[in-house]
């Protein structure tokens, strides 16, 4: 049941990742035309990392086992979100929880916890880098560590609330899926037994 769902979700995510190529190229074009002030070096990082993350799942789906492909896609997505979060010109807030949300599609509560922990660590690292270039640090004289702690506390409260909701949702969804699967299996067994009793081939 979960294996079949994993394969289907992997296929869905590879299509989503391919569509993300458009968003990545749009960011790069906006940077090169001066709409966004990313800087040339950061723009190249977005371009290279973004295209690798967006394109490789469509290739690896032919070779990697479903579970390994799933972990690869979730890991790389969070890394890219972390890269975006380090820049002061990109507002990354609730997006840090995007990977745990994607993990919910697999109906595995343990996966939601694992992706949640990893995503939180990426968020903390990105906030540390990002907070060094905030207005308060550069112009108001507040210390980097002071701003880092303030931002991290705010993000953490928001993050914990969202993760608690996600975990409860995926637990309920998995239970419903298992109950439906059990009912379908029971009906199938009853049908097979009836065919054996009646000798019907229908």
Tell where the protein language model's regions lie, with residue ranges:
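Juxtamembrane or sensor-core-proximal signal-transducing alpha helices
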Residues: 154-185
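Membrane-embedded alpha-helical segments of multi-pass membrane proteins
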Residues: 47-49, 91-99, 153-157
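Membrane-interfacial segments
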Residues: 34-39, 64, 133-138, 169-181
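Hydrophobic transmembrane alpha-helices
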Residues: 17-34, 72-94, 109-154, 164-167
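Primarily the dimerization/phosphotransfer
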Residues: 183-202
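Membrane-interfacial loop-to-transmembrane alpha-helix junctions, especially the N-terminal start
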Residues: 67-71
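N-terminal juxtamembrane segment and adjoining first transmembrane helix
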Residues: 1-66
């Amino acid at each position: 049941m979960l294996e079949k769902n994993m394969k289907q979700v992997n296929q869905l995510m590879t299509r989503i990742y391919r569509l993300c190529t458009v968003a990545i190229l749009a960011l790069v074009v906006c940077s090169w035309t001066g709409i966004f002030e990313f800087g040339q070096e950061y723009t190249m990082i977005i371009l290279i990392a973004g295209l690798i993350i967006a394109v490789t799942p469509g290739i690896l789906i032919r070779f990697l086992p479903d579970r390994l492909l799933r972990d690869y896609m979730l890991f790389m997505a969070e890394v890219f979100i972390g890269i975006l979060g380090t820049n002061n010109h990109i507002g990354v807030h609730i997006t840090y929880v995007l990977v745990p949300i994607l993990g919910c599609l697999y109906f595995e509560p343990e996966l939601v916890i694992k992706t949640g922990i990893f995503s939180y660590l990426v968020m903390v690292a990105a906030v540390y880098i990002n907070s060094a270039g905030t207005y308060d640090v550069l112009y108001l004289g507040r210390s980097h560590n002071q701003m880092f702690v303030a931002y991290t506390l705010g993000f953490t409260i928001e993050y914990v609330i969202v993760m608690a909701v996600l975990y409860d949702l995926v637990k309920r969804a998995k239970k419903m899926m298992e109950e439906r699967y059990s009912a379908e299996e029971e009906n199938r067994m009853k049908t097979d037994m009836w065919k054996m009793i009646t000798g019907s081939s229908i």
